[in-house]
Amino acid sequence: MLDSPKLTARQQQILDLIQTAIARTGAPPTRAEIAAEFGFKSANAAEEHLQALARKGVIELVSGTSRGIRLRGEAVRSINAARGTQFHLPIPGISQLMLPLIGRVAAGSPILAEEHVDQTYSVEGSLFQHKPDYLLKVRGMSMRDAGIMDGDLLAVQSTREARNGQIIVARLGDEVTVKRLRRTAGAIELLPENPDYPIITVQPGESFEIEGLAVGLIRNTMLM
């Protein structure tokens, strides 16, 4: 195992916040959210701590997105082991879930149909606050600003219900998409988290179903 990076108390607190946010919401916090959590006067103070964590090899900062923070698995596991804690990163052999990875979904067939399962992953159960039923490989960058990148594995709990503002897996016509749900008095909208992509409005009479709720996110590189 790698030597554990030496963190200051504040750096450790920020790392814990990042891990908790990813486990609970599927996305890392923004600089503004970190600043608010710790009472910093500006997001710049949060950025300085993130830069320090990046220099120590604990995280990777992704430019162009407010949630562009990626955990570096080996370094974080080393820190958690040194602290005697087992946090939210998958560690083989501990409380494992066997989750099917869903590839492309054929029109009109159930997401969990056998022909859609590319492979099965063993994933640590404590990574998730709510137990997922499957992993869905993210295609494209429409949810970039929520920290969901192309190639990531979205952990999904099968459900037909979701609250306003939650990130869902939706079936719209023959397409399956990951978007943020917004219900208004007269419409259902599927919101991207990237200004380069349009808002999708569900038209009256159009086939629409909620297939699942995002309950976590795994960087594809963590499972290689």
From Swiss-Prot:
Its EC number is 3.4.21.88. GO terms for molecular function: DNA binding; serine-type endopeptidase activity. It catalyses: Hydrolysis of Ala-|-Gly bond in repressor LexA. Gene3D superfamilies: Umud Fragment, subunit A, Winged helix-like DNA-binding domain superfamily/Winged helix DNA-binding domain. The active site is at residues 142, 179. It is an enzyme of class 3 (hydrolase). Keywords: Autocatalytic cleavage, DNA damage, DNA repair, DNA replication, DNA-binding, Hydrolase, Repressor, SOS response, Transcription, Transcription regulation. It comes from the Bacteria. The record marks 107-108 as: Cleavage. The keyword Ribonucleoprotein does not apply. The keyword Repeat does not apply. One of its GO terms (biological process) is SOS response. Residues 31-51 bind DNA. InterPro entries: LexA (IPR006200), LexA-like (IPR039418), LexA/Signal_pep-like_sf (IPR036286), LexA_DNA-bd_dom (IPR006199), LexA_repressor (IPR050077), Peptidase_S24_LexA (IPR006197), Peptidase_S24_S26A/B/C (IPR015927), WH-like_DNA-bd_sf (IPR036388). Represses a number of genes involved in the response to DNA damage (SOS response), including recA and lexA. In the presence of single-stranded DNA, RecA interacts with LexA causing an autocatalytic cleavage which disrupts the DNA-binding part of LexA, leading to derepression of the SOS regulon and eventually DNA repair. Belongs to the peptidase S24 family. Homodimer. This is LexA repressor. It comes from Paracidovorax citrulli (strain AAC00-1) (Acidovorax citrulli). The lineage of its organism: Bacteria, Pseudomonadati, Pseudomonadota, Betaproteobacteria, Burkholderiales. The gene is lexA.
